């Protein structure tokens, strides 16, 4: 899992049926000290995070399991909104 901050939303006029009803967010990975770093990721959002919020994201098989669709074509999912972090 990784920490990140939601930078925006992604809208798609056409997408895989597996993604129907799935909100997509643009998330910037952060290190544990709260410094941005890494490439922006498009993440499926299963918890209703908003722009500017700090989040936990997971990738790969864990992301697909998190949204309850093991065959869904996603690589990353937001699984928590961060209230605080001590490092």
Which functions belong to the PLM regions below?
Residues 1-32, 37:
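N-terminal first-folded block
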